[in-house]
Amino acid sequence: MFRIVKWLIALPVGIFIFFNAYVYGNIITYRAVAPHRTAFMSMRMKQFEQEGRDVALDYRWVPYNRISTNLKKALIASEDVRFAGHGGFDWGGIQNAIRRNRNSGEVKAGGSTISQQLAKNLFLNESRNYLRKGEEAAITAMMEAVTDKNRIFELYLNSIEWHYGVFGAEAASRYFYKKPAADLTKQQAAKLTALVPAPLYYADHPKSKRLRNKTNIVLRRMGSAELPESDTD
């Protein structure tokens, strides 16, 4: 009996250690090499296949300096205004999310920073529970410890979902505007950023009033967004 209990404890611990060792190795690799595809992309494409959707993956990696400053500022203004200065976690946002989750009785809000969103996109699935949030936090801490802010942002910009099968700034810019991501205007960058929280909903509701309102909010805020200090774009 004791041996069974021992194995029941050791097995999940071993899996946890192995997974995090795998993740850390990939984080080191991604400091210099672009991901072939992310865990979130794979999950999403499998979901589309199960739903009977004929969707092809459109994912085009481009370097940081070939993405418009307008899009960078718009995303920071909307998704993580303190990105340049924090260590991966916005503690005020996390506290607010905990309060909202406690009031709702389930995990709905995450208070996620750009770094946390990237951790999820690269390695995790879309489930919402405290165990997954804990793993997300561990991955975020590892990533922030060994990866500079520009590289984190570059990985994020290239892995965001924007439409059915459309991932990354370059694919999104060419899908919506038939131009490279380097040439996005402020209005176009704000519109793309407004799609980020719910890209598939807006794919099905492109004339949503909520989308127009969010675009205008991003436009007003993006001028004051602070990019990472080493940004030379």
Swiss-Prot record:
Its EC number is 2.4.99.28. GO terms for biological process: cell wall organization; peptidoglycan biosynthetic process; regulation of cell shape. It is an enzyme of class 2 (transferase). It comes from the Bacteria. It holds the Pfam family Transgly. Keywords: Cell inner membrane, Cell membrane, Cell shape, Cell wall biogenesis/degradation, Glycosyltransferase, Membrane, Peptidoglycan synthesis, Transferase, Transmembrane, Transmembrane helix. This is Biosynthetic peptidoglycan transglycosylase.
